[in-house]
Amino acid sequence: MSDPLNTEALADIIGCIPDDLTLYDLALTHGSTGRADYQRLEFLGDRVLGLVLASELYTRFPAASEGEMSSRLHVLASGATCAAIAQRLDLPALIRFGAQARSDGGRHSDNIAADAIEALIGALFLERGIEAARTFILAQWGALIDGQQAAPKHPKAALQEWALARGRRPPEYEIVSREGPDHAPRFRIAVSIGKLARAEAQGASKQAAEKAAAAALLAELEGQEK
């Protein structure tokens, strides 16, 4: 029998007392339980998050191009950002897991944390509407938006530009290893620019590991030029 949802902790996170506990119970149930889980709410919450962030970027940065806004949105809505916010709120402590996922460390998975906060946004949207979802999103993401003084450049794009500007071959990425269970994988990716330099990094997804590897290699190359 599952433990009852901690409604007091949930209310502290979303900023209001939930009326429809069924929605929030679903938003915080992992598929490993064998019950209905958060995947559909995650799908919805991901779209709500994107809409609210895109609208806010459009309003706050009137001179920004479509490409600049896309770069900002990519960072703000990334799995890494969502996971960091979920962990700061201690949201994983409320997620229900099956025994195997729990013993595999599911509560410490960034992927699951990111999925859960999107599912929570989906539940909040269904229960209280777009304005409540917007209030929650801006309360948690607002400081990050304010902190974006310039549109961030994706490390892979920056590394590509570095190589092209110096007449080097474009970066090449390869999977070194993939470990961990399906719900909490760990990828190790290597990136190299010919025989000039190489770096490796890990991530909870192939994309995250590639990004981290590109950032590591770029930092190394730029450090050599100083």
Swiss-Prot record:
This is Ribonuclease 3. Residues 154-223 form the DRBM domain. It is an enzyme of class 3 (hydrolase). It catalyses: Endonucleolytic cleavage to 5'-phosphomonoester. Belongs to the ribonuclease III family. It comes from Sphingopyxis alaskensis (strain DSM 13593 / LMG 18877 / RB2256) (Sphingomonas alaskensis). The keyword Glycoprotein does not apply. GO terms for molecular function: double-stranded RNA binding; metal ion binding; ribonuclease III activity; rRNA binding. Digests double-stranded RNA. Involved in the processing of primary rRNA transcript to yield the immediate precursors to the large and small rRNAs (23S and 16S). Processes some mRNAs, and tRNAs when they are encoded in the rRNA operon. Processes pre-crRNA and tracrRNA of type II CRISPR loci if present in the organism. Homodimer. InterPro entries: dsRBD_dom, RNase_III, RNase_III_dom, RNase_III_sf. Its cofactor is Mg(2+). It is found in: Cytoplasm. The keyword Magnesium applies. The gene is rnc. One of its GO terms (biological process) is regulation of gene expression. GO terms for cellular component: cytoplasm. Its EC number is 3.1.26.3. PANTHER family: RIBONUCLEASE 3 (PTHR11207:SF0), RIBONUCLEASE III (PTHR11207). Mg(2+) binds at E42, D115, E118. Residues 7-129 form the RNase III domain. It holds the Pfam family Ribonucleas_3_3. Keywords: Cytoplasm, Endonuclease, Hydrolase, Magnesium, Metal-binding, mRNA processing, Nuclease, RNA-binding, rRNA processing, rRNA-binding, tRNA processing. The active site is at D46, E118. CDD domains: DSRM_RNAse_III_family, RIBOc.
